[in-house]
Structure formats: structure tokens, C-alpha cells
Amino acid sequence: MPRVKRGVTARARHKKVLALAKGFRGRRGNVFRIAKQAVMKAGQYAYRDRRTKKRVFRQLWIARINAAARELGLTYSQFANGLKKASIEVDRKMLADLAVHDKAAFGSIVEQVKAKLAA
């Protein structure tokens, strides 16, 4: 059985890792041993932050809805309760978008909520 030389496969593996490390600063971007560790750590951060992103955006939407609702005389929790009572099924992402870009539409939703809360 012939001896296996690793020239081609090693070069391909190194190229793959260094391509993933493109744009990294210093030796993290051009020394294989360090780049390999940096790429692995970057993958861990990416995995973790794909999950964190969902929580962060939800917090942002709630903060925006709360700010817009308070301008119109309701707290976020009162507003959320009123939405449920008025059976308005608009998600937080859409409500936050309305609160930022279409104040009139958000205001009309708040009026419906206030009417249900008063009743």
C-alpha cells in the first residue's frame, strides 16, 4: 500500500480555514494555528448570538411599544392586556413597526384598546 502524503489535503484544509478567517486582525487572519482557534471561537459566538438575537429584538420591540403607548396614556402591560381583551392579534414586531413608522395606525389601535379597557 503506498504512502499517503498530505500535501494537497493539508493545503485545502488550511485554505478553507484561512478563508473563513478573512478579515480577522493580525495573526488571527494569516497564521493557520491561530486562525483555526479564532474561526472556532467565531462559530461559537455566532451560534450563541443567533439565539440571543431573538431575545434582544423582543426587548427592543417591547421598549418601542411601551414608549409609544405611554405617549398615549397607557403602560405596556395595560396595552397588552387591552389587546387581548379587544382580541387584536398583532404581534410585537408589527406593533413596534407601527409605533415607529405609522403613529396614526398605532393611535387607532390604542383607542380600540382604551375602549375595551373602559368597558
Swiss-Prot record:
**Family designation:** Belongs to the bacterial ribosomal protein bL20 family.
Q: What does this protein do?
A: Binds directly to 23S ribosomal RNA and is necessary for the in vitro assembly process of the 50S ribosomal subunit. It is not involved in the protein synthesizing functions of that subunit.
Name of the protein in question: Large ribosomal subunit protein bL20
Give yes or no: UniProt keyword Nucleotidyltransferase.
no
Entry's Gene Ontology BP terms: ribosomal large subunit assembly; translation
Keywords for this protein: Ribonucleoprotein, Ribosomal protein, RNA-binding, rRNA-binding
Task: Extract one GO molecular function annotation from the record.
Answer: structural constituent of ribosome
Q: Which GO terms describe its cellular component?
A: ribonucleoprotein complex; ribosome
| Residue intervals passing through the bilayer | none
- Signal peptide limits: none
Organismal lineage: Bacteria, Pseudomonadati, Pseudomonadota, Betaproteobacteria, Burkholderiales
* Pfam families, per the entry: Ribosomal_L20
